[in-house]
């Protein structure tokens, strides 16, 4: 059997929309409770985190809105639900910190990325405050100016 190629950074999926819509203040690493077909699909990179968020219920964290597309070669005796709710594994101290922050007005807990940590799949979650429309425009303007500055620095060496 041929070796499967790994993604260079170990990243499976990212939620770029969350970084655009929220001011990210603090990040956590959480484990995921997954079934076998989900792990196989994640190895193939078939996951989307757009519009996914974390809900705290009964002292546990749950990942909502994530989409893991089942492989066509997956087991037929298991009914695969691509958008099922997945339990997140956090330490008690981390859970309490997230609960306290979400209880404050304006804070939301969102999933930023799925990635490999050795042989385990981890989910990077973050506490964030929602951005207003003008904040998003300011961020885009700042990113554009940084890009222009980097381009100017790069081109300066080539002109000589």
Curated annotation (Swiss-Prot):
Please provide the Gene Ontology terms (biological process) for this protein.
trans-translation
Which GO MF terms are attached to this record? Answer: RNA binding
Domain of life per record: Bacteria
**Where would you find this protein in the cell?**
Cytoplasm
List the PROSITE patterns. Answer: SSRP
Pfam families on file:
SmpB
Keyword terms: Cytoplasm, RNA-binding
Which SUPFAM superfamilies does the UniProt entry name for this protein?
Small protein B (SmpB)
InterPro entries for the chain? SmpB, SsrA-bd_prot, SsrA-bd_prot_CS
The record's GO CC annotations read: cytosol
Q: Where is this region: Disordered?
A: 132-160
Q: Which NCBIfam families match?
A: PRK05422.1, smpB
The task this protein performs is described as: Required for rescue of stalled ribosomes mediated by trans-translation. Binds to transfer-messenger RNA (tmRNA), required for stable association of tmRNA with ribosomes. tmRNA and SmpB together mimic tRNA shape, replacing the anticodon stem-loop with SmpB. tmRNA is encoded by the ssrA gene; the 2 termini fold to resemble tRNA(Ala) and it encodes a 'tag peptide', a short internal open reading frame. During trans-translation Ala-aminoacylated tmRNA acts like a tRNA, entering the A-site of stalled ribosomes, displacing the stalled mRNA.
Give the record's family classification.
Belongs to the SmpB family.
- Quote the HAMAP family the UniProt record gives: SmpB (MF_00023)
Q: What is the name of this protein?
A: SsrA-binding protein
Name of the gene: smpB
């Amino acid at each position: 059997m041929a070796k499967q190629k790994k993604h260079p950074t170990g990243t499976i999926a990212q939620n770029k929309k969350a970084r655009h819509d929220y001011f990210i203040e603090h990040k956590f690493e959480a484990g995921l409770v997954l079934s076998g077909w989900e792990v196989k699909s994640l190895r193939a990179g078939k996951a989307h985190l757009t519009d996914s968020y974390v809900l705290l219920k009964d002292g546990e964290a749950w990942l909502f809105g994530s989409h893991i597309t089942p492989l066509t070669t997956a087991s037929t005796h298991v009914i695969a639900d691509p958008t099922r709710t997945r339990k997140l594994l956090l330490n008690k101290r981390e859970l309490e910190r997230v609960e306290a922050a979400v209880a404050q007005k304006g804070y939301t807990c969102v999933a930023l990325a799925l990635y490999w940590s050795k042989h385990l799949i981890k989910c990077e979650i973050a506490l964030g405050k929602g951005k207003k429309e003008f904040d998003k425009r300011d961020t885009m303007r700042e990113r554009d100016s940084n890009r222009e500055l980097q381009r100017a620095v790069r081109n300066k060496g080539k002109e000589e």
